[in-house]
Amino acid sequence: MISSLGNGIIIEMLKIGDKIGILCCSNGQKLSYREKIERLENVLRTIGLEPVFSDYIYEKENIFSATAEERANVLMQFYKDEKIKGIFDISGGDIANGILPYLDYEIIKNSPKMFWGYSDLTTVINAVYKKTGKASVLYQIRNLIYDFKEQQTVDFKDTVINKGNNLFRLDYRFIQGNEMHGVVIGGNIRCLLKLAGTEYMPDFENKLLFLESFGGTVAKMETYLSQLKQLGAFDKIAGIILGTFTEMENEKCMPTIETLVKEKVAKNLPIVVTPNIGHGTNSKAIIIGGELYIKN
């Protein structure tokens, strides 16, 4: 059975004319992406928002747009600037966790601004939740310029400007159990596990663990899931939400991610699958640190 889900979280809304911060906490963007970033700027202005770009968007040497401390400082400047009403990260890759020691979590905790990012920003989003209890949105705003840009733009504007819920309305199906309730943590499985053994990993107790992945076939997923099991995550959580696992699905890998997960967890642990969140350009959003109730 496929049902629709709206996660019912109230996020800080934006208004026409609001300034939003655009930055890259992870890998710098390739210079060849400049035209895409300019298109994104135009779309955001058409929606009615005023994007303010970090000085560290594009890579300078190798993957780096700036040092970890410099990238963290930009994020904190956006939090401190009262004219900036929302913060959107457009990067991904590998190096976002480097900024974590340089963030002022007290300022973040007391800010009404919502942070948006995906993939490698899983590290920042979960660290912010662990340190502050503050929710963030797992979503890539660059989706506004890709294959499904028309629908993405409609859903984004409906949710962020018009106080709708389209961006968070998901299709799902239970593959185990029929009900789950809890605060959502997680994101990209590889990036979440960078936090293992650090002060930034959220507590798994009674949480709903969301997982997705872009790269990796059976061997990598088996490794990641084994690590989560050895961390005790599967004994503590109240449910699992599986997003898309792009390479696994494209390669039609067997066993599937669903089978791998079910082999690692108790038979009474609820598991939900959604095709709507992950690295696809049609992906929607989920709030990490937000409470969610799902029923078959």
Annotate each PLM feature.
Residues 22, 87, 120, 192, ...:
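Buried hydrophobic positions in well-ordered alpha/beta secondary-structure cores of metabolic enzymes
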Residues 244-296:
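ATP/nucleoside-binding phosphotransfer catalytic cores, i.e., glycine-rich phosphate-binding loops
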Residues 36-37, 67-72, 223-228, 253-260:
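Charged helix-capping and loop-helix junction motifs
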Residues 153-229:
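ATP/pyrophosphate-binding catalytic subdomain of soluble kinases
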Residues 8-83:
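ATP/NTP phosphate-donor binding region
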Residues 209-210, 214-215, 239-250:
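Glycine-rich phosphate/diphosphate-binding loops and the adjacent beta-loop-alpha structural elements
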Residues 53-55, 117, 237-244, 272:
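Short internal beta-strands
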Residues 64-175, 293:
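Active-site histidine-anchored catalytic micro-motif
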